[in-house]
Amino acid sequence: MGYNTNWIDEILRTGVSHVHNLMFKGGTAKTNYVVNMNYRNLQGIFHKSDKEEFQGRAEVNHSMFDDKLNIKLQLLANKTGYTSTTDGGSYDTYSWRQAMIHNPTEPIKNADGTWYENTGIFNYDNPMARIYESDGQQDLQQIRISGNVAYRPIKDLTLNALLSYDRISQTGGYYETKHHISTVRDGRNGYASTGSANNMTKLIELTAQYHKTFDGHTVQALAGYSYQQMNYNRQYEQNYDFPTDLFSWHNIGVGQALKKGLATEYSYWLDTNLIGFFGRINYNYRDRYLLMAALRHEAASQLEGTHQPWGNFPSVSVGWRVTNEPFMRNQKVFDDLKLRAGYGVTGSQPSDSFLGKSLLGYGDYYLYNGKWIRALQPTQNSNSSLKWEEKHEVDVGVDFSILDYRINGTIDYYYRLIKGLLYDYSVPSPPNLYTTTRANVGEMSNRGIEVMINAIPVKTHDLTWSSTITFSTNTNKLKSLSNDLYKTSSDYFMTGWIEEPVKTESHIVRIGHRVGDIYGFKVVGVDDNGKWIYLNHEGKEVNYDDFTHAFEDKQILGNGVPKWYLGFNNQVKYKNWDLAVNMRGAFGFQIINGVRMFYENRSRQDWNRLRSAYDKVFGKAVLNTLCSEEFNSYYVEDGDYWKIDNITLGYNFKKIGKYIKALRLYATVNNAITITGYKGIDPEVTTAGLNPGYDNRDIYPHTRSFTFGTVVTF
């Protein structure tokens, strides 16, 4: 068409943000206060991606009766608002995809000023029209109030009462105009949605703590009770087919779709409770031998109707500060050396409620005796054997310091065994009411090492350089998903999803293996015509035309969980100057490059493609246009990276004039440099969950920001 449209540049901008902080404090010997206020006005890199936030914090402390009674009051108030270009979210990431695939020879608008849309191509929208013909706003308000009263009736006993109330309320609305693609292509004739959500948490915690020191012995004992009540409610409605765009989402009832039963509305309400009794004992002998033992006894309303709504979670740890032993007094190596070990159990209640009971739900409408009615049907089997998920952890470690405390650090080894993982098991119906039953019989283990080293390599009168190195590694394994009663039909299940047009699972979870295994077809080359050559499950090479893409030919192509992480933080101070450089990296993992998978493929002639789509695959031939988009090993890459996360340079002025006690000027670069062999935009992708390591093509890219600021102390 003769145009030269850079669609990426059109939807992006340089975001300019400003942040303001104000803190003041004061008081007397008996009463003091601190007030913090923060205002943030943030522009995203996409058009119509704006956020405004105000937050205030206040804390007041007061003591009386010779410091026997101490009262603390805390208040947090937060108000956040952000624009929305997608229903129920913030930014429409689908517009990013459309900018990537859009033909640069097409215009943004027609000659008459209307948006140019090529509706003859499937899933091909004008990204600028998607952004500017949608309008939404999300507003969030939070209020948190807490009060703490501590009373010391006798010298060694402290009674404490904590009360808190936390409420988060969110309201939002969204509208797509009659010029949006949803009308142009789908005929919705204007679309609106509104919704609200409220989260409320109330907490009361009562404790009594006893502290006694005698003849080198120190004993601390704590006993307590806690009760937490949580409420969550939400309502949502949508409508379309509006007479005008003037109302936006503010008059949602005038749309015709809801009246015709074609739109959606629903509401939701959930109450949960958590009650607990707990105790802890700490023992210390001359700061040499340390012991801690604790027990929590908790019940959760999510387990109502089961035989085990209560759980017991013990923990114990021991420590030996070797450097305080008499035989270590004359040694010159360690300034401090402490050996420690611990074992503990923590519990996690299910996120869903009523899991122990049979549930019924409303099905579809059907005609009965001349009337449309909805039938009740089973939606969940009861399972009175459900219980808390438990994490059993063993930890051994050492803390040390050498060279007159110039180098200190910690080294830890841990082993975690999670028992009672929830999983949905297929069961016969009848005799069961429903075809699946949820039970917690799975087991998963994690083991790893965590190291942190702090050092001061240089320390003179004017110059100080301090560094922190962190290292961690973790290996997990799914140990079991079955017991004598509940068994899986196979030793694996598929998870993850690669969206249309590929539409296939991306990961496999297998008993006895790591979580995060990437599972797909392995290619070893292309033929002279640019068609894939596969390696089947027998290890034989198969040409594209003869390959059946059978499930049994899929193989493990990598793992999306890094084997180890490394961090290196540095701070240099020279007179009034200071420089901080923070770096980190992840290593030993693979990434599915979704951008290359879709945009290096030449089978879709109506999409824009990456220039690399015309590179020779495996250095032999350009990929044949008959090879449609698919997920295979060619698009799985090593994800190792090293990032210079943050660089901050600052200068500190001493007292200026009569009123300014201190002044600091600084400049910061975030997400400064990334060193990687990965071909995608950013190797830092999601590494959590069951399908880690997928670089989705519809994702808000990480940004690089430059900040200039000042801190004034009066």
Q: What are these model-derived regions, one by one?
A:
Residues M1-Y3, G44-K51, Q55-Q142, L162-I275, ...:
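Surface-exposed loop/interface segments of Gram-negative outer-membrane beta-barrel transport/assembly proteins
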Residues I11-L12, V19-N41, I45, R57-S63, ...:
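Predominantly transmembrane beta-strands of Gram-negative outer membrane beta-barrel pores used
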Residues L22-G26, A58-H62, G147-Y151, L206-Y210, ...:
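Residues on the lipid-exposed face of transmembrane beta-strands in outer-membrane beta-barrel proteins
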Residues G26-K30, Y39, H62-D66, K212-G216, ...:
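A generic beta-sheet turn/junction motif
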Residues M37-N41, L291-S301, Y343, P457:
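Transmembrane beta-strand segments that form the barrel wall of outer-membrane beta-barrel proteins
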Residues K51-S63, P309-G319, L663-T674:
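Short secondary-structure subsegments characteristic of cysteine-rich extracellular domains
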Residues K563-F589, Y635-K654:
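C-terminal substrate/ligand-recognition segments
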Residues K643-I675:
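C-terminal structured "cap/appendage" subdomains that terminate the fold
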